[in-house]
Amino acid sequence: MFHLVDFQVTIAEILLIIMRTFKVSIWNLDYIINLIIKNLSKSLTENKYSQLDEEQPMEID
């Protein structure tokens, strides 16, 4: 019979083997993910357009 716990353990073992072969630790992975998120958030929050406050409102006749 198929057991979910056995499946989860085998997935975890496979991930550990992959991480050992590529010499990636959980701490390094966390650091890399944080760097990616920080760079993405910086690029998204950069203001490339003029502020609405600086623009002149249109006059309606």
UniProtKB/Swiss-Prot annotation:
Changing residue 58 to A: Loss of interaction with human NUP98-RAE1 complex which suppresses the mRNA accumulation in the nucleus, the down-regulation of protein expression of newly transcribed genes in the host cell and blockade on nuclear import on a broad range of host factors. Changing residue 58 to R: Complete loss of binding to the NUP98-RAE1 complex and IFN antagonistic function. One of its GO terms (molecular function) is protein sequestering activity. Its main location: host cell. Residues 18-24 are annotated as: Important for host Golgi localization. It is a peripheral membrane protein. InterPro entries: NS6_bCoV. GO terms for cellular component: host cell endoplasmic reticulum membrane; host cell Golgi membrane; membrane; nuclear pore. The keyword Membrane applies. It is found in: Host endoplasmic reticulum membrane; Host Golgi apparatus membrane. It holds the Pfam family bCoV_NS6. Keywords: Host endoplasmic reticulum, Host Golgi apparatus, Host membrane, Host-virus interaction, Inhibition of host innate immune response by virus, Inhibition of host interferon signaling pathway by virus, Inhibition of host STAT1 by virus, Inhibition of host STAT2 by virus, Interferon antiviral system evasion, Membrane, Viral immunoevasion, Virulence. One of its GO terms (biological process) is symbiont-mediated suppression of host cytoplasmic pattern recognition receptor signaling pathway via inhibition of IRF3 activity. Disrupts bidirectional nucleocytoplasmic transport by interacting with the host RAE1-NUP98 complex. Disrupts cell nuclear import complex formation by tethering karyopherin alpha 2 and karyopherin beta 1 to the membrane. Retention of import factors at the ER/Golgi membrane leads to a loss of transport into the nucleus. Prevents STAT1 nuclear translocation in response to interferon signaling, thus blocking the expression of interferon stimulated genes (ISGs) that display multiple antiviral activities. Suppresses IFN-beta production possibly by blocking IRF3 nuclear translocation. May play a role in viral double membrane vesicles networks to enhance viral replication. Interacts (via C-terminus) with host RAE1 in the NUP98-RAE1 complex; this interaction disrupts the host nuclear import. Interacts with host KPNA2; this interaction may inhibit IFN-beta production by blocking IRF3 nuclear translocation. Belongs to the coronaviruses accessory protein 6 family. This is ORF6 protein. It comes from Severe acute respiratory syndrome coronavirus 2 (2019-nCoV).
